[in-house]
Amino acid sequence: NDNNEKTMSYDLYFYKRKNSDLTESQIAEYLTNNLTSTSESNTQWFVEDEDTETYFSFDQNEPETDEESIELFENFPDFDNTHFTFNLNYLRPDFFGQFAFEFVEKFIKDLDLFVLNPQSTTDPDNPIKPKAKELYENWSETNSRNSANFFNNMNLNFIH
């Protein structure tokens, strides 16, 4: 991800406690059973609401091989990287976030996961257990800011 792309989407990385016996295949199974994905891939869950056209995705990624990425994502004494990520684009109406984060919260709770949130204003460097609505509010604020900047740069009017 180059920096430009990073500002276009909100990405979360999921971790489990070191002593957890949760497997990647169990996480994949949970997503398959709880989401209606339009993706043919068995490593991506792309969820879309046809009525509102809201969408988000989960991906199962290969373990990092790049030194810098290993340093960032694999180096936590208490947590193991599940290699699952969540993605929601910015420049979207607020209800996109409401739709997506309702499921994200359930996913974290049901599987006892922790979240590395690079967009966090309080702790962008460590996996945490987010409070209710914390991720949605974080996305929503960042989305508003990015949208306003985008529309200003394009000389378009943007109504909050």
Task: Give residue spans per PLM region.
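Short, Lys/Arg-enriched N-terminal segments with co-localized hydrophobic residues
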Residues: 1-7
